Amino acid sequence: MPSASGHHQIPAETQRHDDDQTQETAQGLSAAAMLAQEQADDLDAILDDIETVLETNAEEYVSSFVQKGGE
C-alpha cells in the first residue's frame, strides 16, 4: 500500500528477511576475506622459505642444474 508520501511500504516480515539475508551475505564475505588473507599469508610464508633457501644455497641450487664436462 502506498504511504502518505506515495511510497509503498514493505511488510515488516519481508524487511526482516532481507535484513537477515544481508547479514548472512556480509558474514559470508567476511569469512571469504579472512580465508583469502590466510591463504595469502601462507603463500607469503612459503615464498619466504624458498627465498631463504635460494639465498643460502644458491650456488648448490644452480650447480645442480648445470651440466658438467659436456654432459
From Swiss-Prot:
There is a cross-link at E71 (Isoglutamyl lysine isopeptide (Glu-Lys) (interchain with K-? in acceptor proteins)). Signal peptide: none annotated. Residues 27-65 are annotated as: ARC ATPase binding. GO terms for biological process: modification-dependent protein catabolic process; proteasomal protein catabolic process; protein pupylation. Belongs to the prokaryotic ubiquitin-like protein family. Strongly interacts with the proteasome-associated ATPase ARC through a hydrophobic interface; the interacting region of Pup lies in its C-terminal half. There is one Pup binding site per ARC hexamer ring. This is Prokaryotic ubiquitin-like protein Pup. It comes from Bifidobacterium animalis subsp. lactis (strain AD011).
